[in-house]
């Protein structure tokens, strides 16, 4: 990629765009890729992430991924079973880093920018039995670094370890229920780790109409999400969906 940019920091950015895959035995894939590119976010999109934000500095610069390299292995050794192992390395210029900061008498999600680097490894497994039952489990580990003297501040809300588990099944007729658990260990001990137990149920009626109910944070944990948005107490959503 060759990306020209004009604005507060006019420059030409370069990033690779290479992808390779090898399929063998019809059920196994080895792949590798190296790419990148610009991630533009308008101020409206930032406000959609969290309404409590404060931009440090007078200008907003888009994030540029100068390298996103990864290699992995995908397999389906049995009917309904999928496995995925991957590892990679990223370099992000003007990466949007979020942290809580105090301004006057209020707390804001402070948005800052820095060049960050991350090496990561992940593993995922999923099993499906017809349309009756499905189970997925995944884990990822990240090793972050950032340029500058405020590395701990910039990386505070970045994930160090992510774990997730989800199961869903068909109970009877059009009724389906599911439950899962998400855990995220932050790079900084300043913030509570994400601990989100959630559940959902849906009932399919005729002609594409579906009723659903979702509940998250069933354990009543208190933590901030990746955008410093506070999560407190039980959250419940009930509604209907129509497909046409």
What are these regions, as identified by a protein language model?
Residues 3, 7-15, 19-244:
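Exposed, low-structure sequence patches enriched in small/polar residues
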């Amino acid at each position: 990629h060759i990306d020209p940019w004009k604005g507060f920091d006019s420059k030409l950015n370069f990033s690779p765009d290479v992808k390779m895959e090898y399929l063998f035995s019809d059920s196994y894939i080895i792949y590798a890729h190296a790419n990148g590119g610009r991630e533009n976010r308008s101020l409206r999109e930032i406000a959609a992430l969290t309404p409590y934000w404060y931009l440090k500095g007078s200008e907003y610069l888009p994030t540029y991924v100068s390298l996103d390299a990864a290699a992995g292995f995908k397999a389906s050794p049995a009917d309904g079973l999928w496995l995925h192992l991957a590892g990679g390395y990223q370099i992000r210029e003007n990466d949007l880093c979020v942290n809580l900061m105090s301004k006057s008498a209020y707390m804001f999600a402070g948005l800052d920018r820095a060049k960050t680097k991350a090496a990561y490894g992940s593993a995922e497994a999923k099993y499906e039995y017809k349309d009756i039952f499905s189970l997925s489990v995944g884990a990822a580990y990240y090793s972050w670094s950032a340029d500058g003297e405020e590395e701990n501040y910039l990386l505070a809300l970045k994930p160090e370890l992510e774990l997730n588990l989800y199961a869903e099944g068909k109970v009877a007729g059009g009724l389906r229920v599911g439950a899962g658990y998400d855990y995220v260990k932050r790079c900084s001990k300043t913030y509570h780790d994400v601990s989100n137990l959630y559940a959902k149920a849906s009932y399919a009626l005729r002609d594409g109409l579906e009723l659903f109910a979702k509940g998250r944070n069933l354990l009543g944990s208190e933590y901030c999400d990746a955008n410093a948005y506070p999560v407190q107490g039980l959250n419940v959503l009930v509604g209907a969906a129509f497909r046409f």
